[in-house]
Amino acid sequence: MSDPTRPARIDERSRNVTEGVMRAPNRSMYYAMGYRETDFSKPMVGVASAHSTITPCNSGLQPLADTVVAALKEAGANPQLFGTPTVSDGIGMGTEGMKYSLVSREVIADSIETCVNGLWQDGVVVIGGCDKNMPGGMMALVRTNVPGIYVYGGTIKPGHYQGRDLNIISVFEAVGEFTAGRLDPVDFKEIEKRACPGSGSCGGMYTANTMSAAFEALGMSLPYSSTMANEDAEKLASAAESARVLVEAIKRGLRPRDIVTREAIENAVSVIMATGGSTNAVLHFLAIAHAAEVPWTIDDFECIRRRVPVIVDMKPSGHYLATDLHQAGGIPQVMKLLLEAGLLHGECVTITGRTIAEVLENVPAAPRADQGVIRTLSDPLYAEGHLAILRGNLSPEGCVAKISGLKNPAITGPARVFDSEDDAMGAIMARRIVEGDVVVIRYEGPKGGPGMREMLAPTSALVGQGLGESVGLITDGRFSGGTWGMVVGHVSPEAFVGGPIALVRDGDSVTIDAHRQLVQLNVGDEELARRAADWTPPSPRYTRGVLAKFAKLTSSASKGAVTDLDL
């Protein structure tokens, strides 16, 4: 670990472009932006902002960026604001545009790394909102390993209609209800208009809120910051404090890899399990661990699942939203319960310089009695975690199932096979999928999609049609954090590389059994061998541009779908 007592130069990196006779031209560029000679002894701190009017998840980030810039100046640093791209999962969902979502994780990580290292910045504040902003930013922080902190843009507040709280998943499920004749046109339109009342990331324990909670547990974001609403004043105050904390970290030489250790990742994943977080966290923490050079495998999630119960009652399968969790005590309250039970590593250091145990010292040992969001460990929603790693002849490298909230976590039924999400969605909307079917959506993996689209539209349509627990769905693609039901994703190896999912035929018997951690194609080995011999790899869907590059470089989902695994 970096020595927190060392008298380090706080411009240790930036002096490469500001110090000495040979750097006069470099300094001249800074003078053009209003720098003074005395500024060159201050740390240059990047502010990587994903502000955008593309999506409500990011449309409220500019005030946070402005606040961070001002606070950095007050703390004696030179803020250097730059932008990172974002892709809206909610807007791209169900279209070809969704293929760019996971790709954007890599683009975000690459863009931040490029600016931080290209400009010799001494530290960086990453400000993000939508789903892939989260892992992309954290991957960049641990790659560059300069002092850094993550500032989450904050959650959206709930919408309201007829006495019911709404969020974006309400609209996706309303599509299924409407097509099934269970929702009239007026109510359908009102839900569409009222679900998202302002700025902030999708409000349940979906992917963005899952990752923000995990970053708080990881020690890379400030306490309580992950559940604050974007539009509330406390979010601005937290952003300013984040800037001040980062400057102190620069002075101490405290770096991301001092914080993001194997034990810290175990803490983060424990919180993901306890809060009922998104399946995407499996993919993203494989990628973050890879970037941090921390040994971590898909089986490590399973080890933690077996010892950590679900104690937070959050949507999509539960009842509450992130704003409710914040009012109930936020992630520190959840972490305190886990720490008291011996389920967290209290010695892990955080960006504040304090340990997890020190940060949680004054948090109550028990949740308040006047709230229903956070349970005790003696009265959990589920005795074990909800993200199960399944294996079988259909997915020998492993796949991910979200098993919370299911009355019967096992199904055996006939396969209904589709070679794209679009074909599957057409069949669902035409009511051709019936109770007992197992929908198989393939050629949607990291290479085959490419980009591993999220299957939120088909899963939500099934839920809306009343088939969420009576129809299984298996895919080499991903799921949104808002997905629930009998669903299995990240099937590896994927169809595009000849994985067993490519061999499934319509009508084959398929079993999903979460209790046995099994995903099985009930076809004999000899028949599967014949099918494998007859299988031919498909042509790439893209041969130019960023999707083609991603398809060429990406690893298996079981390794995090990273693009620099074998370089």
Swiss-Prot record:
Cysteine disulfide links: none
Superkingdom of origin: Bacteria
Residues with the N6-carboxylysine modification: 132
Transmembrane segments: none
Pfam families xrefs: ILV_EDD_C, ILVD_EDD_N
Active site as annotated: 480 (proton acceptor)
InterPro entries xrefs: DHAD_IlvD/Edd, Dihydro-acid_dehy_C, DihydroxyA_deHydtase, DiOHA_6PGluconate_deHydtase_CS, ILV_EDD_C, ILV_EDD_N, IlvD/EDD_N
Binding positions (Mg(2+)): 89, 131-132, 454
Residue sites binding [2Fe-2S] cluster per the record: 57, 130, 202
Cofactor: [2Fe-2S] cluster; Mg(2+)
Co-factor: note: Binds 1 [2Fe-2S] cluster per subunit. This cluster acts as a Lewis acid cofactor.
Keywords linked to the UniProt accession: 2Fe-2S, Amino-acid biosynthesis, Branched-chain amino acid biosynthesis, Iron, Iron-sulfur, Lyase, Magnesium, Metal-binding
Pathway stated in the Swiss-Prot or TrEMBL entry: Amino-acid biosynthesis; L-isoleucine biosynthesis; L-isoleucine from 2-oxobutanoate: step 3/4; Amino-acid biosynthesis; L-valine biosynthesis; L-valine from pyruvate: step 3/4
E.C. numbers: 4.2.1.9
GO MF annotations, alphabetized: 2 iron, 2 sulfur cluster binding; dihydroxy-acid dehydratase activity; magnesium ion binding
GO biological process, one term: isoleucine biosynthetic process
Self-association state and partner proteins as the record states: Homodimer.
NCBIfam families tied to this protein: ilvD (TIGR00110), PRK00911.1 (NF002068)
Family indicated by similarity: Belongs to the IlvD/Edd family.
Name under which the protein is recorded: Dihydroxy-acid dehydratase 3
Encoding gene, per UniProt annotation: ilvD3
